[in-house]
Each structure stands twice: as structure tokens, then as C-alpha cells.
Amino acid sequence: LYTDGSSRGNPGPGGYGVILEDIKSGVIRECSEGYKLTTNNRMELMAVIAGLEKLNISPVDVEIITDSRYVCDAVEKKWLFKWESKGFKNKKNKDLWKRFLIHFNKHKIITTWVKVHNNHRQNERCDFLALSASKKTNKKTDHEYEKNIQTKMGFKD
């Protein structure tokens, strides 16, 4: 599972790109999505979640290959599980981390970090998909992110 997320501005319009590659069958699928206002870390994490949600079988061994230290370190350094044990108190993107954990607990997942813009073919393709999605005119709304912005500005429901 190759992933990348980006935002043009942080926050700003963003997108993610995903390549799913089934090693056994050789089948390759791509997906991407754009959002009106979001952050780079939300898009990095959303890319992983979108890829995991596309898996048709469960449980399965999954290698997530990403240029996101945010995602890799949270898993490999076990920060995510510490955050979970504390109820994600004061953690950014807790809505997405909770969604990620649902899939993490279903599958056997490892993460592999790749250096950004280092001629890694699949990472470059995911970057292209993410950037292209961020430029589409029919982008989605990242409701949770926008709700959090309004709450911080004092516009609570």
C-alpha cells in the first residue's frame, strides 16, 4: 500500500493518492481524493485509511509505504497506542487515528518510510495523484477539520 498526502498551504486545499498493489496477483489499483481545506498530516493519514478501506479481504498482511514520518513514527515508535490509552487527549487528528486503529487491529500492518522526492516510482505517482486531487474543482469538505477550526475560534455548536 503506497500512500501520499499533501496540502497546498497548511492548512489549504489538499489531497491524497494511494496505490494498492497485490503482490500475489499483480493487480494494481489507484485512488485519490481532494479536500477544500485540510492539512498535510490529515491527508497523509487519510491516504492510509482510504487504502486500508479498499482492501477486500481481512485479515491480511499490509505494508504501508509512505514518505510520512508522522504516520510511520506514530506506529513504529508506538506513540499511537500511548495516545489511545490516554483517550487521544489534546491530540490532533484523533478522528482519523481512531479510524486507522479499526483497520490496524484487523490486519497485520507494518510501515516503511521512503524519502520524499527520491525517484521512488510509486511514491512519485502517489504524490502526483495527491497534488492532482488537491487541484480538482469538486473537492470534498473535511468536516472534522473545519469543525475543529470553528471550535478553536469560539464558534461552538
Question: Which residues does each PLM region occupy?
Answer:
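RNase H-like nuclease fold core
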Residues: 1-43, 53-60, 136-146, 153-157
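RNase H catalytic domain
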Residues: 6-13, 49-125, 129, 152-156
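Short, conserved alpha-helix that lines the donor NDP-sugar binding/gating region
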Residues: 44, 48
